[in-house]
């Protein structure tokens, strides 16, 4: 049987992670500063949380996430993440989002759209944000882990409303 065109698929009703770790090292690229997330050298530890209705199909992951917690080597922390989430090479979409990070809290719907995974390397210019947020607090020091240029800008920002655009050109 020819399986060369078979799409990789995993499905699970439920999954629980307790103190997991994910590490990715691109040996062809030097390590960036440790105070920002380096997508070529990820080291995510203390991963704990519950997942339901999980589907992994090709490069896409869909799941309901409950109380996900983790720490990235840069110092970025997710203190709590609850959401219905889709992650793929074209972006991340979250519904019913509650995200508590080092200093901020995001409630609502949030999406990041990209052309490819490599777009995250130029986060400010290439990642399109689209969010409907309720009673949220964005702290630019949290965003600085992805885009160091925004560190210490207008912090914190409390708001409810719709946000769209790249970080460099928010509307």
Predicted regions and their residues:
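Flexible, surface-exposed loop regions and adjacent strand-edge segments
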Residues: 147-150
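Extracytoplasmic loops and strand-loop junctions of Gram-negative outer membrane beta-barrel proteins
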Residues: 142-145
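Elongated, acidic membrane-bridging lipid-handling scaffolds
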Residues: 2-127, 136-138, 154-157, 165
């Amino acid at each position: 049987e020819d399986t060369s065109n078979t799409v990789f698929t995993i499905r699970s009703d439920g999954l629980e992670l307790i103190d997991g770790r994910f590490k990715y090292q691109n040996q062809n690229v030097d390590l960036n500063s440790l105070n920002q997330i380096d997508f070529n050298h990820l080291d995510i530890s203390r991963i704990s949380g519950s997942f339901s209705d999980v589907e992994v199909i090709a490069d896409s992951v869909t799941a309901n996430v409950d109380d996900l917690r983790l720490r990235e080597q840069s110092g970025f922390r997710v203190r709590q993440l609850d959401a219905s989430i889709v992650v793929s090479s074209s972006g991340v979409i979250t519904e019913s989002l509650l995200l508590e990070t080092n200093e901020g809290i995001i409630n609502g719907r949030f999406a990041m759209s990209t052309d490819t995974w490599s777009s995250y390397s130029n986060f400010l210019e290439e990642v399109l944000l689209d969010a409907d947020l309720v009673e949220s607090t964005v702290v630019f020091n949290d965003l600085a882990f992805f885009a160091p240029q925004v560190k210490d800008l207008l912090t914190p920002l409390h708001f409810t409303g719709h946000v769209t655009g790249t970080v460099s050109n928010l509307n």
